[in-house]
Amino acid sequence: MKKNFIKKAATALLLVSTLALSACGKKASEPVKIGVPDDGTNQSRAIKLLETAGLIEVDPAAGYTPELKDVTKYIYNIEIVPTTANTLTSTLGDYGASTINGTYAIPYGLVPSK
């Protein structure tokens, strides 16, 4: 059940973020900053999303709840920046990409299914 929920949550976030994340850091001279929620549950989901998108590698021992310390490799030149979840929409301009929960994305006009 938990595995399926995390997979669905990551897929929903992936739908919102794929275009922005796919080009992150490929030729950037400075790291591209990616905003992620700073609370444990949502940060784990964001890390799994970034792993699924092929931007980072995570220690398999972390399972379904990885933390930033579990990131073993950055595939691209990115920097993961923990930020209060409810401010990620209003700080979009501060980051190259953000992983935003539907709870905050939808009221801001971001549609996860598009």
Can you say where each PLM-predicted feature lies in the sequence?
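A ligand-binding cleft/hinge motif common to bilobed small-molecule-binding domains
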Residues: L88-S113
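Bacterial signal peptide processing site
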Residues: G25-K27
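Alpha-to-beta junction loops
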Residues: V32, L55, Y76-E79, G93-I100
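Short helix-initiation/N-cap motifs at beta->coil->alpha
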Residues: A62-S90
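Bilobed "Venus flytrap"/periplasmic-binding protein-like clamshell domains
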Residues: P31-T72
